[in-house]
């Protein structure tokens, strides 16, 4: 089996064999690169090849023809065929090591007819650390689904998840019709690189969410609340979108001095607040996009639209962080 060296532009490097993706090998070597789904669907791990040869593990349908021609690949979906130089730096943060552990359902709270909050209880001896914004995979009957943790700290060895009922969803039948307290499941995590990056050059923090995409945004907001030194002199905006009033099942409670919350609905006729889509409502606000950071979680459509619209207003590519539900 051949093994190759993968180089980053900040002079770090790691080894990767011919059967392992660039992303998986990086994480195995404690090199933190952007990622989310591991399934070549979300674009989070997009990276540019400056030199070297790689091969796709599966057909890739996310990147545009222009991106491919420019040398972009999804690091979760390519294996090396030579030494490779990537046009990327590592995240300069040590990610908590994912672990697979049993867990039990502590309780299930119905928030709306289609949304529940599930509280999972971890074994007493498990020390579970995560960055606010990360997610876990719930494993049942050999299948897995991803859910974002909706809080910033693991207290009493409990994790809380917002879960939506999707018609035909693989786990929806279980969560909404079968699940009960003390059910035994397995969990893998924490996963993903959706978390707050403290950038002293940014003056505004913009949080965008649709539906249960509010979960990691809520976690990040709690983190900012508990560490006010991270947001001194920064304005924080939260735009949370849904179709109907019942979709806004959570109310932010924060004492941050420069915080603005704008709920957005698209199909509520009697709604007196902002109507439309979160990215479009955000554009109507006096936000200095050239000096802003954006954290977006929710539908792929929202995230792709937000990145395009906001970049046209001056938002820097490196200041847009997203976690798409795929």
PLM region spans:
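Short, surface-exposed secondary-structure boundary micro-motifs
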Residues: 50-53, 89, 141, 190
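N-terminal pre-ligand scaffold of iron-sulfur
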Residues: 1-33
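FNR/FR-type flavoprotein reductase catalytic core
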Residues: 157-158, 163-326
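Short Fe-S-cluster ligation motifs
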Residues: 61-94, 102-111
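Ferredoxin-reductase
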Residues: 97-184, 202-203, 242-244, 265-268
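Local cysteine-cluster metal-coordination motifs and their immediate loop/turn environment
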Residues: 31-53, 69-81, 216
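Residue-level "contact hotspot" at macromolecular interaction interfaces
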Residues: 15, 36, 79, 129, ...
